[in-house]
């Protein structure tokens, strides 16, 4: 009976797993394989195509538009990651302290994460286009009197603001979870040794929440490198392609620009870049944890 029961359980687990694996293969693995195959062709998204070997990959390194999108995306990812984690950590420290209504504040700060990125993007689009310039005119400020989204020098800052605003919520929750794992005994021992303020955070709190910091850093960099919805809602890559992210370029030129094969090669390279960066982040933060 025992063996039959175990075999029955295994069969049940197998029957549950097979549909999930099949769906994952059909909607994730298979498109990935087809994308890699198309990256070696001149496929336009329709009609016939010819094999071109590594030409698409070679052209990526000489295409100025691709280079510009990589520069913008990395600049956005670096700045947005720093802004998001600094603000999130400050908020987490405040919300983890003994204050009134902290549960209400935690819920309020999490609302941006519930909203869809496109919805948030369109709301901020209206804010940057109409509301902020109106305030700028009232205050007599020329820089604020015109929409940030119409300036090649300021549009990327608007994208950073929107990306950070929506990402801060989840990061704050993760940091709060990390802070709650720090034993009170550590702070009591630190207080005896005279640790207060910045020294308390630097030498006691931060080393103990390094794993949570690592998670936030990896998630932030990955999400910001793949930014798409905010670009679509705010600028559509403009003005003058100054806010064209890699994901938006792949979508725009691949789907409607007749560069399906070329942008498939771009997507493959981009995938490799994200994997390499994520592995490097985990390796560096892992070594940091061991040192601490």
Regions found by a protein language model. Give the residues of each.
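A structural signal for multi-pass alpha-helical bundles of membrane permease subunits
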Residues: 3-292
